[in-house]
């Protein structure tokens, strides 16, 4: 769920998790359209696409099991849908951590009107 995703982000970036990314660029937060503005926004685009492929549960509300082991996020071995959601969140959190150098404060609260020409998943 979103709380768990926020914990993963915090662990991988040292930031305040979702609060640092919830209104970033064209894809971080609810919905999304346009071309990702940078590598950080692309992490959100890929995450949105991943959620779009999940079947059988609501990715934003589903509670899954995971742990942190030696700095790595490890998803539990539960039913397919929950494991898929966890993997989407895990990959995105790692992506944010790997692309912190592209995070640009000018893309926080970015105007959705500027987001055009959508990419395809």
From Swiss-Prot:
Top EC category: hydrolase
Domain of life: Eukaryota
Main location: secreted
Residue pairs linked by disulfide bridges in the UniProt entry: 26-115, 28-44, 43-95, 49-121, 50-88, 57-81, 75-86
Cellular component annotations (GO), alphabetically ordered: extracellular region
GO BP terms, alphabetized: arachidonate secretion; lipid catabolic process; phospholipid metabolic process
UniProt cross-references to SMART domains, sorted A to Z: PA2c
Name of the molecule in the record: Acidic phospholipase A2 PLA-2
